[in-house]
Amino acid sequence: MDVADPEPLGLFSEGELMSVGMDTFIHRIDSTEVIYQPRRKRAKLIGKYLMGDLLGEGSYGKVKEVLDSETLCRRAVKILKKKKLRRIPNGEANVKKEIQLLRRLRHRNVIQLVDVLYNEEKQKMYMVMEYCVCGMQEMLDSVPEKRFPVCQAHGYFRQLIDGLEYLHSQGIVHKDIKPGNLLLTTNGTLKISDLGVAEALHPFAVDDTCRTSQGSPAFQPPEIANGLDTFSGFKVDIWSAGVTLYNITTGLYPFEGDNIYKLFENIGRGDFTIPCDCGPPLSDLLRGMLEYEPAKRFSIRQIRQHSWFRKKHPLAEALVPIPPSPDTKDRWRSMTVVPYLEDLHGRAEEEEEEDLFDIEDGIIYTQDFTVPGQVLEEEVGQNGQSHSLPKAVCVNGTEPQLSSKVKPEGRPGTANPARKVCSSNKIRRLSACKQQ
C-alpha cells in the first residue's frame, strides 16, 4: 500500500478539503460565549502607603492614588524615575527645587507635600501629596463651551489670587500659572500645583527680578515673548493669572498662533480683544491684568480692590460638575484602592502560604524632602587631626537600621516567598530608616 495514498487513511484530498470548507473541522466560538476572568489586582505597599490605580501621567512620571495605612487618608503619589529625569532638560534640578519649595509652604490653596520616599535600588522617588479629585483643565474639557459660568469662575479666581498672594509673600514666583496646574478637591478647594519651574527669590533681594522662564508659551507675558534679559517675576504671575481668567470665562485665549513663533509674535505686540458678553467690569479687570507694560500691570492689591473681584455674582447658569473618571467612567470618583484592600485582607486566611502582596524593600523616608546621600562624620585621630569618613545616612539625620541585603534575626524577610508572613506584620514593616 502506498503511504502517500490518502484513501485508505480516511483523509480528504486537497480539492475535497477546499470544497467541504474549513468550518467543518474548526469549531468557531462566538465572543459573547467567552467568559473573561479579570486579572486579580495585586496589592502593593510602598512604605506605609497602599498603591491604587493610575490617576494621570505627565512628562516627569506617573501619578497614582494611594492610601495611608496608618491614618487611612487618601493621597496621591507622583512616581519619578531618576533614569527618566536625566533625559529631561533640568529634570532632576526642577524636581529637587519643587521638593525644597513645597516643604516650606502651608496654605489652603497650595498643594501640600505630605511625604517623600526614595528607593535607592530601583532609583525611584515617591512624592506623596494631598489628594485632589480633578484638575481644572479636565473640567473645562468636559463641557462643549470650554468655560465656567461667571459665578463658578469667580470663586476659583478668588482662591487662585489667595494662593498666589501667599506664594509671593514667601518670595516665590510660580512662573507657570494655568488651568492645567490648578487642581480641585471634592469640596471645590483650588490648589496651585507643579512648582517645578518656580523660583525662590533671595531673602535679601531688593526686588522680584527674574532672569529665566520655562512656563507654558500661551501664558507668557510680552516681556518674555520679546526676549528681555530681566523681568518682574510677580508681574509674570499676574499676567498668567489674567490669561487663566480670560480662558475660564470665555473658553478662548487672548493670544493664539499656528506655532510658537507666531504665538510669541502676537503676545509681543500685546493686541487682543475681549468678547462683548464679558461685560465692562470683567473686561476692565482683564485689561488691567494683561497690561503690556509690567509697571502699569495690576498688582494683587489692585485686583482685590476691583469691583468684579469684590462683587457677589448670582448663579445664572448651571455649574460645571466634576466629570466622571476617564478610565472607569465612575461619576463619583470612588477610591481605587478598595480592590487592593480586598486582596490585602480578604484572602489572607485562604492563601496563607502565598506571598499575598508586594512590598518594595529599601524604602527610605526622607522627612526633610531631599534625596538621600552621604555626609561626612568627623573622627579625631591620635594626632588631633580630624578624618572625614563617608557614612550613609537618611536625610532626616537618622542612621539606616539595616542594609537592603541584611535582615535582623527573627524578622520575616519579604524577599523570600517561601517564608510565611502575616499581613499585619507586612503592614507594620518599618522603613530602612527610623522615622522621627
Swiss-Prot record:
The keyword Mitochondrion applies. GO terms for molecular function: ATP binding; LRR domain binding; magnesium ion binding; p53 binding; protein kinase activator activity; protein serine kinase activity; protein serine/threonine kinase activity. This is Serine/threonine-protein kinase STK11. The modification Phosphoserine is found at S31, S325, S403, S431. Residues 398-421 are annotated as: Disordered. The gene is Stk11. Its main location: nucleus. PANTHER family: MAP/MICROTUBULE AFFINITY-REGULATING KINASE, NON-SPECIFIC SERINE_THREONINE PROTEIN KINASE. Residues 49-309 form the Protein kinase domain. Its cofactor is Mg(2+); Mn(2+). It comes from Mus musculus. Changing S431A: Does not prevent S-farnesylation. Defects in neuron polarization.
